[in-house]
From Swiss-Prot:
Protein name as it appears in the record: Cell division protein ZapD
Species the sequence originates in: Burkholderia orbicola (strain MC0-3)
Lineage: Bacteria, Pseudomonadati, Pseudomonadota, Betaproteobacteria, Burkholderiales
Gene: zapD
Cellular compartment(s): Cytoplasm
Quaternary context: Interacts with FtsZ.
Main localization of the protein described in the UniProt heading: cytoplasm
């Protein structure tokens, strides 16, 4: 099944963006070629843009504290797997401690590093990091892969508590959902939400159908419409019945 996820609010949208960026960063950092490490570095700059929001850290700390207070009373409950509970609570508490230790504005260390700041300013220009534009950056790219990797890992380090916090919040949200098998009649599906507040919607579709879900929702109703794309033309609405799995997640 192919999984599509749709956030119901700006906070979850931001966390999904962060998750995607950190996954891309980790993939390219693990590679060997200087061009792949260039992608890792430019992705690091994107992460700094997203995490630079003034309220992101405080939002994550509030949510983790709320989850800790929700889960802590289940300690000693015979109906709850205690080892799993303690593992989650320990992870939350450690991440809260790491967030509390973060000093200053997120990503400020990148701004304060003049060399990185020069690369960052050139990276937004198409072709702006050629060897004649940034000879010192080109020289750095000729260093051994492991040395480049260590440098980039050092630069991402101050932002890792935010990655860990986002991962916990998204995991708890995803685990809260119950999947149901539904049918989009003639490619369209609607469901009343009765005012219930959800954080995230997951749509899983069989890959062989080659359909693409488009979703929208408010506090009263959600709507999923399926489209199909032929080559490089704009996707078109389908008029066939589409079976899929729908999961609504709420922290």
């Amino acid at each position: 099944m192919i999984l599509y996820e749709y956030p119901f609010n700006e906070r979850i949208r931001t966390l999904l963006r962060l998750e995607d960026l950190f996954e891309r960063f980790a993939f390219f950092l693990a590679q060997e070629d200087p061009r792949e490490h260039h992608v890792a570095l430019t992705t690091l700059f994107e992460i700094a843009e997203v995490t630079g929001r003034a309220d992101l850290k405080s939002d994550l700390m509030k949510e983790l504290e709320r989850q800790r207070q929700t889960l802590a009373p289940f300690r000693g409950n015979p109906g709850i797997e205690q080892n799993a509970l303690e593992a989650v609570l320990g992870e939350i508490e450690q991440t809260l401690a790491n967030l509390a230790q973060m000093q200053g504005k997120t990503g400020q260390h990148l701004v304060d590093n003049e060399w990185l700041a020069s690369i960052r300013s050139r990276a937004v220009i198409p072709g702006g990091t050629c060897k004649f534009d940034l000879p010192s950056y080109y020289a750095w790219q000729q260093w051994p892969a492991e040395q480049r990797r260590q440098d980039i890992a050092k630069w991402i380090l101050p932002m890792l508590p935010l990655r860990d916090a986002a991962a916990i919040v998204l995991r708890l949200a995803r685990e809260s959902g119950q999947a149901s098998k539904v049918m989009a009649m003639q490619g369209s599906y609607q469901q009343m939400l009765s005012g219930r507040s959800y954080q995230l919607m997951q749509v899983r579709v069989p890959p062989e159908l080659r359909v693409i879900p488009e979703a929208s929702a408010n506090k009263y109703m959600l709507w999923v419409r399926f489209t199909m794309q032929d080559g490089d033309v704009r996707p078109r609405a389908v008029d066939i019945d589409v079976p899929f799995h729908l999961t609504l997640c709420n922290l």
